[in-house]
Design a protein with these regions (language model features):
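…primarily DNA-binding HTH/wHTH and HhH modules…
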Residues: 1-15, 208, 230-240
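Short, Lys/Arg-enriched N-terminal segment that forms or immediately precedes the first helix
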Residues: 30-33, 133-141, 180-188
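Terminal helix-turn-helix DNA-binding modules in bacterial transcription factors
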Residues: 166, 185-223, 229
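N-terminal regulatory/effector-sensing and dimerization cores
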Residues: 12-104
Length: 240
């Protein structure tokens, strides 16, 4: 799903005046466009950022300048640039994140992106096509996905509101524990983590249609508005 973020900013749904579009996946979210100067912050997601003349400032006010950076999970940072950028935020425990961040490079230091990743992120193609290419290149688990997990993912993507592990498991004939095990085997994360990313996606879609924060939180299955506000902030560093 592609969501125009500028429309949300114009409706007063976000404090940050980002101008561009979002694209969601099972364990990631991609943004392309103009970013606003943000405060020093950290989030759970592994972050990749690409563009012209990007300055990344860390918690020690040390600045790095370049065209592409990998920011590990939990590292405080600030990104500034006057040019359009691409940002990719990924569930840090997923196979996708592990493939993009080889074990020898893991740590708490901002690192330069490889030329292959940088070229893919900056390719002049639709955002979804760019992500499909990146996932094809860096999907670590190449085994054939279990048909039951495919059914669970299909059902998750077909429902409009309030997804739960119990609901998805019942629909495809799997116990909660079995669905968790299958998801962890194929994606590297339990199915509950995939649902969180889906909930953020659903909430953003509701906001794009004009829903209030409270209604968007309800539509996506968050406990309340405060829960919805906290999850995107902690996960991807964006506060609705």
């Amino acid at each position: 799903v592609i969501i125009n973020l500028s429309s949300l900013a114009n409706k007063g749904k976000f404090n940050l005046k980002w101008q561009g579009e979002y694209c969601f996946g099972e364990t990631w979210i991609a943004f392309r466009g103009m970013s606003a100067e943000n405060n020093l912050h950290a989030h759970a997601a592994l972050q990749l950022v690409a563009g012209a003349g990007i300055t990344v400032t860390d918690d020690n006010t040390f600045e790095k300048q370049g065209n592409g950076w990998l920011i590990p999970s939990g590292v405080k940072h600030r990104i500034t640039t006057s040019s359009p950028i691409v940002i990719l935020l990924i569930e840090p425990d997923s196979f996708f994140a592990n493939a993009l961040q080889p074990s020898q490079q893991k740590g708490s230091v901002v690192q330069s992106l490889s030329l292959e990743i940088l070229d893919t992120l900056l390719a002049d193609i639709p955002l979804r096509d760019m992500m499909n290419k990146l996932e094809t290149l860096y999907h670590q688990n190449n085994s054939v996905i279990d048909a039951r997990l495919i059914s669970a993912m299909t059902y998750l993507n077909s429902i409009d509101k309030r997804p739960t592990v119990e609901l998805i498991g019942k629909h495809v004939g799997l116990s909660v524990s079995r669905l968790r095990a299958l998801s962890t085997h194929y994606f590297g994360v339990p199915f509950s983590k995939i649902i969180v990313w889906k909930q953020v996606n659903l909430a953003f879609q509701s906001l794009a249609k004009g829903a209030s924060l409270a209604d968007a939180a309800y539509d996506a299955g968050f406990a309340d508005q405060a829960h919805f506000t906290r999850i995107p902030r902690d996960t991807i560093g964006v506060t609705p």
